[in-house]
Amino acid sequence: MKRAGSRVVPALAASLALALACCAVAAPRDNINDWAWLSDIEARRRPPFRIFDNVAYVGLDWVSCYLIETSAGLILIDALYEPYTETLLDNIRALGHDPADVAYVIVTHGHWDHAGGAATLQEKLGARVVMSAADWDLVARDSSSGNTRFTPAREDLALGDGEILTLGDTTLTFHLTPGHTDGSLSVEFPARDGERTWRALTYGGVGINFSDPEKLKTYSDSVRRIMARGPFDVNLTNHPGMAWVFPLARDLAARQPGEPHPFVDPAAMAAFLKQRLAAAASS
């Protein structure tokens, strides 16, 4: 597989202008067939846009996928789901890249909307797929049942708390944050803006989809652990509506030279984590 170094492509201002509406999407019902919008390709697609010099958004209107550019290839955070893998590949091409340069696909947790496209990317691109050991087990157990079934990726790399992955000039650090799933994996990575480099985080599983007291404690403990490992400067959530990704993209498109980067906001990140603790306490 080709492992060419990534090119730095100018920001897609026109694409940013189109990516304006932040989605607030309810969780799917038990019967996925009641939600035809999930497979409405034209309605769900969004043009890709650059967030930092080395980070771009290549996801949908309701579920995120981030492209990290390194000196030795590309990394994806999350894999979307079918029928959107071709949309994802088109978004990568629109940024001036060859999808064959994707070396790793990091899956934040094993639910269908984040892991469902990993098998196709693994097959088409030869990319290595990374998940936590617990969520590799989750995918093996649950991907073939129910209305959200999907073809799982072949089990590949299992990374855990504190482990790192380096590709070229970029190192990712993984934080195991169980709660949303038993193996939700948060990803820390550098976000570069000119001469500045910021600490960015994609939290592994934000939603509280349970009410069991022990699971709520596990979720809260994970959030506190991330807070202790901060501060983090940039909050790039795996659902864009969780942290106003599209409105911030609008602000970024209007940014003037010398103005602060709208996605860099350690206080907002800290408030987001405190809000997750409050949500768990009230669940």
Language-model regions, residue ranges each:
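Bacterial Sec-dependent signal peptides at the C-terminal "C-region" and cleavage site
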Residues: 22-29
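C-terminal regulatory/interaction regions
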Residues: 269-283
